[in-house]
């Protein structure tokens, strides 16, 4: 009590002081795993913490460790050869999704109230939907965001973290109710149908928004071909540094220790008339 009186807590600076949290394994944590989930990097340790871990610590969170994720965060399920599968706490025979699957499992099971995630192609949204959590995919430049159980927790973190402050983007209008919100009951994969449970959830959300005064309109046909989007997203990984680095020392003997996606994207950068096809060098 005397120490607290002499050194009072600055709750404005550390609003989450003492709250236990976990960091996604892809988010660098000092003295923690730094393998990117690649089996060939087994035992590699981080010398320092990355931006997410530093931000969590600055806000007062007590970081207990790191969570599971797929190799290089590429897959939408969490099952790397290095760390194995992330079990869904609602049904351990099922996966938590990916790539922030370990974080989703940890929060959904009650291990911690918050765990960091990252999302480019669904890596927060998919695990959240598979485990019943709130998973916000913020505006483009804010790709790092935690997984939590309630929208109140998501709002509290988003308002306090410096990682969410816009730097170059146009500020949103003050009166959000002037914006028109679109929704659809179609999927971008045109041969697939939404489940009745998903449709019910969407329509309940639409009803809520309309009661709150928002203008909501249905889009009858999804404007994007999801299969073309998947192709573009995948091809975009060709030549990416992390994939090239992962296959740099691959041999015929150890290449089975790599995820086929990693191997394919990493070696594709060597294809071409002047390419060096010796990926073992």
Predicted regions: what is each one?
Residues 22, 40-44, 144-149, 272-274:
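Short, well-ordered beta-strand elements within core beta-sheets of diverse protein domains
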Residues 48-50, 54-155:
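Short glycine/serine-rich loop segments
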Residues 45, 49-52, 202-206:
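Short catalytic helix/loop segments, enriched in acidic residues and glycine
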Residues 1-42, 73-74, 172-174, 243:
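Short, well-ordered alpha-helical
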Residues 27-29, 69-70, 121-123, 189, ...:
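Solvent-exposed loop/turn segments at secondary-structure junctions
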């Amino acid at each position: 009590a005397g120490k607290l009186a002499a050194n009072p807590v600055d709750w404005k600076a550390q609003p989450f002081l003492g709250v236990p949290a976990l960091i996604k394994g892809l988010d660098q944590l000092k003295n923690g795993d730094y393998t990117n989930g690649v089996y060939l990097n087994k035992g590699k340790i981080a010398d320092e913490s990355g931006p997410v871990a530093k931000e969590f610590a600055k806000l007062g969170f007590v970081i207990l460790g790191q969570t599971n994720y797929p190799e290089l965060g590429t897959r939408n399920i969490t099952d790397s050869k290095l760390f194995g599968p992330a079990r869904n706490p609602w049904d351990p025979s099922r996966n938590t999704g990916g790539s922030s699957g370990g974080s989703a499992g940890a929060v959904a099971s009650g291990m911690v109230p918050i765990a960091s995630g990252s999302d480019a192609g669904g890596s927060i949204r998919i695990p959240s939907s598979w485990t019943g959590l709130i998973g916000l995919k913020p505006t483009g430049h804010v790709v790092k965001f935690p997984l939590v159980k309630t929208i109140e927790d998501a709002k509290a973190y988003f308002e306090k973290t410096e990682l969410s402050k816009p730097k170059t983007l146009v500020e949103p209008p003050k009166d959000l109710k002037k914006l028109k919100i679109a929704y659809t009951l179609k999927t971008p994969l045109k041969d697939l149908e939404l489940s009745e449970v998903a449709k019910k959830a969407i329509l309940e959300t639409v009803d809520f928004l309309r009661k709150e005064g928002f203008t909501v309109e249905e889009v009858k046909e999804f404007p994007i071909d999801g299969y073309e989007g998947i192709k573009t997203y995948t091809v975009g990984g060709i030549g990416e540094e992390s994939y090239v680095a992962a296959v740099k020392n691959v041999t015929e003997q150890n290449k089975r220790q790599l995820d086929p996606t990693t191997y394919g994207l990493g070696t594709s950068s060597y294809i071409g008339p002047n390419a060096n096809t010796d990926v073992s060098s």
